[in-house]
């Protein structure tokens, strides 16, 4: 438990957690003095509103809190969302501090993310490195979550549920297996996923979707494994459907190379027929897996290398080259003088024919 979480629980002990505006502080102008109040709303959903408040007087230790109206959302989704987000700590999800069930609302206390929604951030004209980094982080975190919790789906990854905040620039490592990884720059940004109210998670029942009320848009315990991948890439596709510059053209071509355009577009989102239209609820859609997408040269920056070339490269790097053996070539004999050789042979033959004189 962090110091911030510990101090928050001390301040909002018991029923105090049902009235955070009476204890958490916000700045009042013109002098910026910190006083207890609800303050400015940070975001709003169908049944919820999000605010922030500081646990101290200098305004440096803010927390966010999400108030869910239980007179409209009567199924108790707040407790479910808190449990799921708590399980996903370390996967690009805000830290969860506390859940409180009150008379007319559920309240979730969580890490305050000083960031912009993806849709708003996109309008600031970020560079290609930043865009690639955000896309890669979202997809890689989804891949990592599915490795740890195979049954997980977020089901609501539109631009309002992805936050982008500035962070120090550093390298991040994308690991796709024991011997498969690559490094890229984070582009000085971090992507954060929020709002798990429509998600499914192993061994935790979501009361919002358990009655089958969202099956008409493919949201259920049996939804397609690539639901989130498709929804997120379609969210980006809508922004580059008519490329306005070279960066958008590259993103357009990247998504087009992965998903047929008949499965993409504004009408897919507006009509809420993401699954029915493309048929991936029955496994008929041509939707690639996370590994295929993360291995794309759009992210890696390299061309695909054939398995044979990789194998040869590994063999070469592991094999020590021996010193080459030098074979001595015998010296050639001097050319034979045939005339001299014949004279010498005749002399020898005559000597053999001389009579032998014996002494008496």
Feature roles, as predicted:
Residues 313-360:
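Intrinsically disordered, Lys/Arg-rich low-complexity segments
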Residues 67-68, 121-124, 204-209, 237:
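Short coil/turn segments at secondary-structure boundaries
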Residues 86, 92-129:
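Conserved structural core of kinase catalytic domains
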Residues 1-40:
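Juxta-kinase regulatory segment immediately upstream of eukaryotic protein kinase catalytic domains
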Residues 208, 217-320, 324:
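Helical subdomain adjoining the active site within ATP-dependent kinase catalytic cores
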Residues 47-87:
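ATP-binding glycine-rich loop module of kinase domains
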Residues 125-155, 159-160:
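Conserved kinase catalytic-core helix
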Residues 151, 159-223:
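Catalytic activation segment of kinase domains across protein kinase-like and atypical kinase folds
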């Amino acid at each position: 438990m962090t110091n911030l979480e510990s101090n928050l629980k001390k301040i909002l002990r018991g029923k105090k957690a049902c009235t955070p505006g009476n204890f958490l502080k916000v700045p009042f102008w013109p002098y910026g003095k910190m006083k207890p109040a609800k303050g400015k709303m940070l975001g709003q959903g169908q049944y919820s509103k999000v605010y922030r408040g500081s646990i101290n007087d200098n305004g440096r230790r803010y927390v966010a809190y999400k108030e869910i109206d239980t007179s409209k959302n009567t199924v108790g989704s707040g407790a479910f969302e808190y449990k799921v987000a708590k399980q996903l700590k370390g996967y690009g999800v805000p830290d969860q501090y506390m859940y409180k069930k009150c008379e007319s609302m559920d309240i979730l206390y969580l890490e305050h993310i000083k960031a912009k929604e993806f849709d708003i951030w996109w309008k600031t004209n970020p560079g290609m490195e930043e865009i690639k980094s955000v896309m890669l982080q979202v997809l890689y975190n989804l891949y990592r979550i599915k490795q740890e919790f195979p049954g997980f789906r977020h089901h609501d990854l539109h631009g309002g549920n992805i936050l982008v905040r500035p962070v120090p620039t550093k390298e991040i490592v994308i690991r796709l297996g024991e011997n498969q990884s690559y490094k890229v720059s984070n582009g000085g940004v971090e992507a954060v996923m929020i709002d798990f109210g429509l998600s499914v998670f192993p061994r935790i029942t979501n009361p919002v979707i358990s009655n089958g009320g969202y099956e008409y848009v493919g949201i259920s315990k049996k939804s397609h494994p690539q639901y989130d991948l498709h929804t997120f890439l379609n969210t980006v596709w809508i922004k580059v459907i008519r490329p306005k510059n070279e960066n958008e053209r590259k993103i357009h071509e990247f998504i087009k190379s992965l998903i047929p355009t008949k499965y993409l577009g504004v009408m897919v989102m507006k009509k809420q027929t993401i699954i029915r239209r493309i048929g991936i609820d029955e496994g008929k859609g041509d939707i690639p897996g996370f590994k295929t997408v993360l291995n794309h040269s759009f992210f890696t920056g390299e061309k695909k290398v054939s398995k044979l070339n990789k194998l040869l490269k590994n063999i070469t790097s592991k094999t020590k080259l021996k010193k080459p053996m030098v074979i001595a070539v015998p010296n050639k004999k001097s050319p034979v003088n045939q005339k001299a050789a014949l004279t010498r042979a005749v002399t020898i033959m005559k000597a053999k024919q001389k009579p032998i004189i014996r002494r008496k």
